[in-house]
Amino acid sequence: MAGSWQPLKSQPTFSASTMLLLTDGTIMCQDGGGTAWWKLTPDLHGDYVNGTWSPLASMHHSRLYYASAVLRDGRVFMAGGEYSDAGSETNKAEMYYPTIDWWAEIPSPAWSEVGDAPCCVLPDGRILVGSIDSTETAIFDPVTETWTDAASKDDSSSEETWVLLPDETVLAVECSAHPKAEKYVIAADEWVSAGTLPIELVQASSIEIGPGMALPDGRAFFAGATGHTALYTPPPIANEAGTWTTGPDFPDGLEAKDAPGCLMPNGKVLLIASPAGEGGSYPGPTHFFEFDPAANTMTAVTDPANAGGPCFTGRMMLLPTGQVLFTSGSSQAFVYTPSPSGVLEDDWRPEIVSCPTLLRAKQTFTLQGEQLTGLSQAVSYGDDAGLATNYPLVRIRNIKTGHVRYCRTFNHSTMAVGTGETTQHTSFKVPAGMEQGEAELEVVVNGIASEAVRVNVGPFLLHFHLDEAAVNQLIGSLADGPLWVLGPHGPVPVDPWGPKIGKQAEAARDQIITAVRELQQLGNEVEKLREQADRFEGEIEPSRGGIRATVAH
């Protein structure tokens, strides 16, 4: 049984294209290949179909077909652009700061061109990027904002799709040396052979390929620009070659030539394909399919109304609800709800090991769990857009109202996939205005939610650390000793009926009132500073005047 499509109730007023899932549960979406970005926010019940659009800050440079990634601290990395106002195949890079809605230009790699280079976020949070002009690769460290050379490949990275595997290797089908494959062994900083494919996935005239992703069973799946598909089984030892088998073909000569794909929570992969076209020919329309890894079958599903163009215009985003949002460079966007047919195994779910049960708005907490970064990067396009969603989101549902809010997550302990029973952690910040009372908290990754835990959301509290001795001195008599001492419920008199009360008591009262007013004023100032700091919490603050700092409290 196939899934179903729904249009967004509030359709975009722009040319909806590349999308990324931010760690607060919102979706950022580019307007065509320009500088403008928009944000889709789900409604009060966590429904994206009924969500609303709002504008975001614009990038410094327009870019179309480029490297992109959401980082472990929640920032968004972008580099290159096959087409850009900074020049064709630009090497310009920038970083988006969601907490302050701001873009900062960051250092470019040493190459003169980045263009539509593939990239992959490594388990430690760094980003591996490939050169489109040579065999070189480089790694960007988002903490230090520096580039370092990585090992060279067997061929150029041009047009390749990269897949992060559970054994901490990055798998690539070689588009410039097809049908060979290779993989990057992260621990060894080495590219090694991943064998030879039994069937061609790369179209020779365009050296294009389709999407690829790790599957829940540990294999990797690639869809080809030739209409064929293939599956890779990793070896027991990371630097060995592994094995390939053929998958099902797309029917009727259709091809996934520069196309997105998405691993859904039911274990199936949503794919698109278009009629065959050689070289620079990319005919439409786009047709949709579900690949079932368990049955090794390709099944056609209904096409949405915005599928009239070629498949390279399409983008997919896996929503925290388990649905898939599809855009195609138009002012239409549709949501696919997969059929429950398929298997959602319990061991695919993230699991909460520990989480505070008393939460407060505007405060930060730590959640520990297993499989917080999922079994796969889940969403793929290839070289033209990095769309991975393998990071934890925290979702809270108020039991009384049913309202849903997402907490911004950051500082994930790893970005690896398929981590099994290894305990991981992430930080999350309860948003301002969070409804108080009993609630259920879930951690969500790749559209799959953990079992919920009960929490209680309390009001925001601003804490002061008071020195009791200093307070006693403040409200006491310097000549005769303290008139008051600080008790569990506030100041209490030492001798309420004796002769000490008089003018000294009145003076002490005035001092207390003055001190409280000063504390209230200080509290307002501290709260303003706290709000400013909160906007950067968990992120590396943008470089200003040569000074960089991590803001935390």
PLM-predicted stretches and their roles:
Residues G476, L483-V485, P491-D495, A549:
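Short linear proline/tyrosine/threonine-rich motifs used for host-factor recruitment
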Residues Q504, A508-Q511, A515-E518, E525, ...:
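Long, heptad-repeat alpha-helical coiled-coil segments that mediate oligomerization
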Residues I448, G545-A552:
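C-terminal "tail" modules appended to repeat-scaffold proteins
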Residues D467, V471-L474, L478:
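Compositionally biased low-complexity segments at domain edges in trafficked proteins
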Residues R530, D534-E537, R544:
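Coiled-coil heptad-register positions
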Residues M1, L529, A552-H553:
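Sec-dependent, cleavable N-terminal signal peptides
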Residues M1-L462:
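Kelch-like beta-propeller repeat domains
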Residues L462-D467, P496-W497, A505, E539:
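Extended alpha-helical heptad-repeat/coiled-coil "stalk" and oligomerization rods
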